Design a protein with these regions (language model features):
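A short, structure-level motif marking secondary-structure boundaries and short turns
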Residues: 19-21, 122, 131-133, 163-164
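Iron-sulfur cluster-binding cysteine motifs and their immediate structural context
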Residues: 136, 142, 146-167, 171, ...
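Rossmann-like NAD(P)-binding element
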Residues: 1, 176
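Short loop or secondary-structure boundary microenvironments that flank
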Residues: 22-25, 140, 171-172
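A mid-sequence, solvent-exposed acidic-amphipathic segment
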Residues: 111-145, 149
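FMN-binding flavodoxin-like domain, especially the glycine-rich phosphate-binding loop
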Residues: 2-123
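Active-site-proximal loop/hinge segments that shape catalytic or ion-binding/gating pockets
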Residues: 199-202
Length: 202
């Protein structure tokens, strides 16, 4: 009946559906496990009936981490290939999320997910996630302020006639957004980024 249908719709709306779509250059390790652990400690989410994600996905996108000697952006051909494949996968993901499809876990965790999350990830958190190595090549910088504008945590001030300055508030994610968006390649991360490429999604 119409009344039953309407009642079912209300029940569906009340049932929480949490999902996660994460991106990576090659693999995500134990990202979803860590997320679920965080959700389990969040009283506000627990009160809403959310104890873990109902569906999880990973999209392999072009490499953007350039903070180590052996890491650089992908060649153009690989970049295009990854973006094309991810666009197709994203269409399917959107449909499944719209339909609130539960129990889906299409993830690229990598060959040794615990090692890259716990050991390598731990090293990154302690040593490599910092703004202290960022600096500007003043002979290239035009003081446009793009780096300050795109920083997701507001860790950079500058532009409008001033050189960029990292604020060392310990908020830096070392996401390299400032590096990749600089139109004159004037931002470096120690010596690790010299002669390396830039990438951001267009």
């Amino acid at each position: 009946s119409d009344a039953t249908t309407e009642g079912n719709k209300k029940m569906v709306r009340k049932h929480p559906f949490a999902y996660c779509v994460c991106t990576a250059g090659d693999s995500i390790g134990l990202t979803i496990e860590n997320l679920n652990d965080t959700i389990a400690l969040n009283a506000s989410l627990q009160a809403l009936g959310i104890t873990e994600v109902s569906a999880s996905y990973s999209l392999i996108m072009p490499e953007s981490y350039v903070g180590l000697p052996f890491m650089d952006v992908d060649p153009k051909e690989r970049e295009v290939r990854k973006k094309s494949k991810s666009a197709q996968e994203l269409s399917v993901i959107c449909e499944e999320i719209f339909d609130r499809k539960e129990g889906v876990n299409r993830l690229v965790k990598g060959p040794i997910p615990w090692f890259f999350t716990k050991v390598v990830g731990g090293f990154f958190e302690k040593v490599l996630i910092t703004d202290k190595r960022f600096h500007v090549e003043k002979d290239k910088c035009v003081k446009c302020g793009i780096c300050a504008n795109v920083c997701p945590v507001g860790d950079i001030k500058g532009g409008h006639g001033e050189y960029p300055e990292w604020l060392h508030h310990k908020d830096c994610l070392t996401c390299f957004t400032c590096y990749h968006h600089c139109p004159h390649h004037a931002i470096e991360f120690g010596r690790q980024t010299q002669k390396k490429g830039q990438y951001f999604y267009k």
